[in-house]
Structures are given as structure tokens and as C-alpha cells.
Amino acid sequence: EGQPDKRVLDQVSKDIPILALHVSGHLACVNSAALELAEIDERTPSPSGGVIGRIGTGNEPSGYLEEAGMLAVQQAVASRIKIDFAGIVQGMQKTYIENGVTTVQDGATSEGDIKTLLAMSAGGQLKIDVVAYPLMPSGGKKIVEENQGICGTYCHRLKIGGYKLVLDGSPQGRSAWMTEPYLGGEEGYCGYPWMSDAEVQSYVKQAVEERRQLLVHCNGDAAGDQFLNAYERAIKETEIEEDLRPVMIHCQTVRNDQLDRMVKLKMIASVFVGHVWYWGDIHMNNFGPTRGNHISPVKDAMDRGLVVNFHQDTPVTKPNMLHSVWCAVN
């Protein structure tokens, strides 16, 4: 029960740094060697938008990390991890094709990623269409400026579709940003945001001014409010009314009043509907029956005339679109 900590991983090795990443990508557990390598100790505060877990009520790091709390360790071990990104892309293409998917999007494209994708594109190695969405806080504007030729236009199966923002964590990991508290655990705990309202407003306005599509990760309804508020304000301030097809990604705990606002913005609801199958029991425990039974509200969105699509957040779950349809129907 509960999340593992460094005491579990220290049984494997106290000398070799170990990083165990949750399948969602939002949580991690590391051993004592990894904490030491990242220079995380009792004096290290939790960063904005993340958590460094502690043992009991003290300050000793437990090895449990959330969101931005993982960054120091990930950066510290990066040079020790040899990742063949091109090889991963080749393998994933095969998996997507086997599941009947011929167009995919990369929702967190880095400068290194786009260079690899460009090389694969030029070499005829892309067998499916790839739409890249660089993260705005991580050099997204630079990537777009340096690759104008593939912005909105395919070149050898590759194009940049717009920008990506991540506003919160995951509901199953209790880091999604909610307006009402989670059940159990710390009283009044609602998760937390990744960025301030001012930061989000700046990025959203930039995307609108550049007339680029914006995909925004919102698992919690508070994150949804932050996105909707920023987009409504950006439209008002810029007076740009053309349909830029903004997308709310995940929509796990989106409320009906938020769906109504999305209609006015012509916002697309991209729903990770497989949550009801993979983590439905966790959501009921975290949110109770009222909110838990409103996870992934596909029909409520469709009844309002919203454009709805499904995704699997691969590699979080396999890219089986028919399973997503089954989850939505049954």
C-alpha cells in the first residue's frame, strides 16, 4: 500500500543511483544514491509545481518525488542514461501501425527530439505522420522559429502543429489541481498548479497572437479553470476570433459549466477515457461517488456539441483506440 520510497530501492543498491518512474510520468521513486547525486537533502525545499517527499513529519527526503520535484534527479542521471530516441520512434511506429493508427502527435517535443525527427523525416524513416507540439516553457518558441517550413505543413510526414502546455499532474497520483479537496490524506489538499496564472496567461496570449493551435494538459478542474480563464482573456485582449482549435487534454474532472465555456471557445475536448478502466477504483477513492462518476464525461461534452476525441497518452497505455471506444460506451 502507498508509494515506495528510498528504503525499498536501497535494498536493491545503495551505491548505484536508481530512478523508478511511474507509468504516468508524473511520479518517481529514487534511492539514496540518486538523492545524493542530485544533491537533495534535508535542506532542499520542494520546488514550485512539485514535491520532494519526506519521511514522517521530518525533513529527511524519502525518495518519493512528484512533478517538478523529479527534475533535479532526472538531470543528474541524464548523462548516465543512453537513450536511442530514433530507435524508440522506430519501435513505436510499429506499435501504432499494428493498432491501425497512422497519425500521431508528440506532446512534449524538445530541441533534441525535433532534430531527430527532422533527420528521420529527411531520411524517409517516418512511416506514419507525426505532428509535433513543443512545450512552450522549454524552448517551444525557439523550435517554432527555427522550423517555420514545417509549421502547419507536412514535409516528409512531419509537421509542427502548435504549442503544448502542462498545467497540473495526475488524478491517480493526487497531483492534479482540483477546486475541491481529495478524499483521505492531508485535510484540504487539492493538488497544485505547475505555473502561475500570469505565466499561463502570457503563454496562451502568445499562442493566440501567433495564431497557433494550443494543446493544454488539464487533469484537475482547477487547471481547467486556469486554462479557460487565460484563453477567454487572450481572445478578448487580442480581438482574434478565428477558430484556432484549442484543445483541453485529458479532461478527467472537467465540470459541466466548463464544458459550456469550451463550447463558446470552440475548444476541443481530448479525453483520456481509458482512465475509467485503468484507474476507476482509484478515482472513486480519491474523489468519492459524485466526482468519481463524472470522470471523463464524454457524453456530457458531446451533448453540448463539442468536438471530442480520445487518446491513450501512449506509452502510459497502449494506443488501442477501440479499447477507448469500448470504455466510453460500456
Predicted regions and their residues:
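Generic beta-strand/beta-sheet core signal
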Residues: L21, D106-G107, V131-L135, G161-D168, ...
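Short helix-capping segments at alpha-helix termini
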Residues: A122-K127, G152-T153, A234-E242
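Catalytic pocket of metal/acid-base enzymes, prominently hydrolases
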Residues: G2-A132, Y154-V208
